[in-house]
Amino acid sequence: MSPAQQLTLPAVIVVASVMLLGCEGPPPGTEQIGYRGVGMENYYNKRQRALSIQANQPVESLPAADSTGPKASEVYQNVQVLKDLSVGEFTRTMVAVTTWVSPKEGCNYCHVPGNWASDDIYTKVVSRRMFELVRAANSDWKAHVAETGVTCYTCHRGNPVPKYAWVTDPGPKYPSGLKPTGQNYGSKTVAYASLPFDPLTPFLDQANEIRITGNAALAGSNPASLKQAEWTFGLMMNISDSLGVGCTFCHNTRAFNDWTQSTPKRTTAWYAIRHVRDINQNYIWPLNDVLPASRKGPYGDPLRVSCMTCHQAVNKPLYGAQMAKDYPGLYKTAVTQEALAGSAPASEAAPAAATEAAPEAPAQEVPAAEAVPAAAEPGAAEAAGSVEPAPVEEVAPAPAAQRL
């Protein structure tokens, strides 16, 4: 063996060993989520799962407070959202929220010291709207959050700004006018796939068409382009990464578009996408004029939410811990629901109707051809505050029980 060969063999062994370090150690965990023998399984790393469970522990609920006595609005000034709570429950809720959102900063993160009624601090205005957001989520979007619900801690996890909030990504700078459409950027947003790096702005902020699969075998019957398919798959990669699952969590991969072969989770995901859009458009964008520059992106757009903001790589946030049920202030009261019944957004009305009657399965029409979402180009976020109406064919899916 020549000296060169003697040096090459150890080098190959070292390189191969380094490459193997990037692989997950066997055996992986497996969960059957569909019919046996058809690949409807979810795979996970057992070591990573144990670490994830440890990192997603809920906060212990505070002891119950007296629900009788005067209301908070009768004792304190400028109480606009939680005015239906007793003083005891109101105080308990304030302490809990401080623990969930600003444990280090304390009450003064949202209140002017010495004058808790003052609105002269932007965080007070924002937090009031966030209370309304949580109440709407728990009361109007049960098709998404079910009876588990959400709390401030679901997103914040002890941080004033949620760790996984996002803004429109301008992408890398190019020296010429020839720009790719976002591929090969190596973005965590699409799980480092070679796909457009910002599927969040067009699909979770705006309401661009997501469906691209046709119903016929021949491609000529489907006007959707390959480029549009890349945007859609970028969103799917983001959702999978955000929930820590694979495609088969929602879809049967032999027919991605067929609702009758999909899992019940796809119905939940349908509502979840619309819930996220509702949060971004109706609760966060209207606060943009109140937020400081430090809470905005390069285009001046506010920090918004995506699936990752709440789920944090877990298919059920905090593994389904029911924290909200211990805090009545995080739900709309009967009085509040009656007052808002006439002004509820249409997107919020759909989930409620889904539990009363079984709507037809989504129509499988061929989606209209669409241009690449404008969010890929710089400056697109300036117009992101406006949302186009949802496509006609995206009616509410049939209840999961009928598709098992």
UniProtKB/Swiss-Prot annotation:
<keyword id="KW-0564">Palmitate</keyword>
<dbReference type="InterPro" id="IPR036280">
    <property type="entry name" value="Multihaem_cyt_sf"/>
</dbReference>
<keyword id="KW-0449">Lipoprotein</keyword>
<feature type="binding site" description="covalent">
    <location>
        <position position="152"/>
    </location>
    <ligand>
        <name>heme 2</name>
    </ligand>
</feature>
<feature type="signal peptide">
    <location>
        <begin position="1"/>
        <end position="22"/>
    </location>
</feature>
<protein>
    <recommendedName>
        <fullName>Photosynthetic reaction center cytochrome c subunit</fullName>
    </recommendedName>
</protein>
<feature type="binding site" description="covalent">
    <location>
        <position position="107"/>
    </location>
    <ligand>
        <name>heme 1</name>
    </ligand>
</feature>
<feature type="binding site" description="covalent">
    <location>
        <position position="310"/>
    </location>
    <ligand>
        <name>heme 4</name>
    </ligand>
</feature>
<feature type="binding site" description="axial binding residue">
    <location>
        <position position="251"/>
    </location>
    <ligand>
        <name>heme 3</name>
    </ligand>
</feature>
<dbReference type="InterPro" id="IPR003158">
    <property type="entry name" value="Photosyn_RC_cyt_c-su"/>
</dbReference>
<dbReference type="Pfam" id="PF02276">
    <property type="entry name" value="CytoC_RC"/>
</dbReference>
<feature type="binding site" description="axial binding residue">
    <location>
        <position position="144"/>
    </location>
    <ligand>
        <name>heme 4</name>
    </ligand>
</feature>
<feature type="binding site" description="axial binding residue">
    <location>
        <position position="94"/>
    </location>
    <ligand>
        <name>heme 1</name>
    </ligand>
</feature>
<keyword id="KW-0674">Reaction center</keyword>
<comment type="function">
    <text>The reaction center of purple bacteria contains a tightly bound cytochrome molecule which re-reduces the photo oxidized primary electron donor.</text>
</comment>
<feature type="binding site" description="axial binding residue">
    <location>
        <position position="311"/>
    </location>
    <ligand>
        <name>heme 4</name>
    </ligand>
</feature>
<dbReference type="GO" id="GO:0019684">
    <property type="term" value="P:photosynthesis, light reaction"/>
</dbReference>
<feature type="region of interest" description="Disordered">
    <location>
        <begin position="346"/>
        <end position="404"/>
    </location>
</feature>
<feature type="binding site" description="axial binding residue">
    <location>
        <position position="156"/>
    </location>
    <ligand>
        <name>heme 2</name>
    </ligand>
</feature>
<feature type="lipid moiety-binding region" description="S-diacylglycerol cysteine">
    <location>
        <position position="23"/>
    </location>
</feature>
<feature type="lipid moiety-binding region" description="N-palmitoyl cysteine">
    <location>
        <position position="23"/>
    </location>
</feature>
<keyword id="KW-0732">Signal</keyword>
<keyword id="KW-0408">Iron</keyword>
<dbReference type="InterPro" id="IPR023119">
    <property type="entry name" value="Multihaem_cyt_PRC_cyt_su-like"/>
</dbReference>
<keyword id="KW-0602">Photosynthesis</keyword>
<dbReference type="GO" id="GO:0009055">
    <property type="term" value="F:electron transfer activity"/>
</dbReference>
<dbReference type="GO" id="GO:0042717">
    <property type="term" value="C:plasma membrane-derived chromatophore membrane"/>
</dbReference>
<keyword id="KW-0813">Transport</keyword>
<comment type="subunit">
    <text>Component of the photosynthetic reaction center composed of protein subunits L (PufL), M (PufM), H (PuhA) and cytochrome C (PufC). The reaction center interacts with light-harvesting antenna complex LH1.</text>
</comment>
<dbReference type="GO" id="GO:0030077">
    <property type="term" value="C:plasma membrane light-harvesting complex"/>
</dbReference>
<feature type="binding site" description="covalent">
    <location>
        <position position="247"/>
    </location>
    <ligand>
        <name>heme 3</name>
    </ligand>
</feature>
<feature type="binding site" description="axial binding residue">
    <location>
        <position position="236"/>
    </location>
    <ligand>
        <name>heme 3</name>
    </ligand>
</feature>
<keyword id="KW-0479">Metal-binding</keyword>
<feature type="binding site" description="axial binding residue">
    <location>
        <position position="111"/>
    </location>
    <ligand>
        <name>heme 1</name>
    </ligand>
</feature>
<dbReference type="GO" id="GO:0005506">
    <property type="term" value="F:iron ion binding"/>
</dbReference>
<feature type="binding site" description="covalent">
    <location>
        <position position="307"/>
    </location>
    <ligand>
        <name>heme 4</name>
    </ligand>
</feature>
<keyword id="KW-0472">Membrane</keyword>
<dbReference type="GO" id="GO:0015979">
    <property type="term" value="P:photosynthesis"/>
</dbReference>
<dbReference type="GO" id="GO:0020037">
    <property type="term" value="F:heme binding"/>
</dbReference>
<feature type="binding site" description="covalent">
    <location>
        <position position="110"/>
    </location>
    <ligand>
        <name>heme 1</name>
    </ligand>
</feature>
<feature type="binding site" description="covalent">
    <location>
        <position position="250"/>
    </location>
    <ligand>
        <name>heme 3</name>
    </ligand>
</feature>
<feature type="binding site" description="covalent">
    <location>
        <position position="155"/>
    </location>
    <ligand>
        <name>heme 2</name>
    </ligand>
</feature>
